[in-house]
Amino acid sequence: MIRSTLIFREDGLPLCASVDDDTDPSLQEQKKKVKILISRFTPTSANEATVESGDFEIHYIRLNTVVYIVVAERNYPRNLAFSYLADIQQEFEHSYGGQLSKSNVRPYEFVSFDNFLQKTKKVYNDKRVQGNMDQLNQDLKGVKQIMTKNIEDLLYRGDSLDKMSDMSASLRQDAKKYRASAQKINFDLLISQYAPIAIIAFFFVFLLWWMFLR
């Protein structure tokens, strides 16, 4: 399950974070570790990685000077976590891309983006979406090759997030294919949720037209 989402500028400025009702002390500890990780980024740090941290995994992607981070339970599918991050990145860039590099941006200035975070998290935590992962995982293995590090090594043993190797062109293409497939699953889920309502509404309008307006 996705537990928390955080968005930072690479210089450490927090731009947005999900408003989590969960007061679990262990989750709060993960958020503290995320802030430390952000301070360790260098120009050579990997653009995508997973950091194992106790019962959680911290997944992140970096793009256009912004770092998108999700804290998920250890058993949550990694491919789904990175697809979630890709959706978050795309919408955040579309909504605020022109404002992110300004020097007068305040901490958590884009907190209103939490509305999108909550809606998207609800979709990605839906068991029906996760159930469709099996077939995708059989065809698309590339995202699983994301670099994995341990939080203790990063914080206390001098390890870094530097790239182990660049993703190959084919791997990047597989990642794009995966995200497109996952987005289709999300769309199909929304259709299944709202199609009955739309059908009932259409029937009601048609009935009114038939009785009074024709």
UniProtKB/Swiss-Prot annotation:
It is found in: Membrane; Endoplasmic reticulum membrane; Golgi apparatus membrane. Residues 1-192 are cytoplasmic. Residues 132-192 form the v-SNARE coiled-coil homology domain. GO terms for molecular function: SNAP receptor activity. SUPFAM superfamilies: SNARE fusion complex, SNARE-like. Residues 214 are vesicular. Belongs to the synaptobrevin family. Required for transport from the ER to the Golgi complex. This is Protein transport protein SEC22.
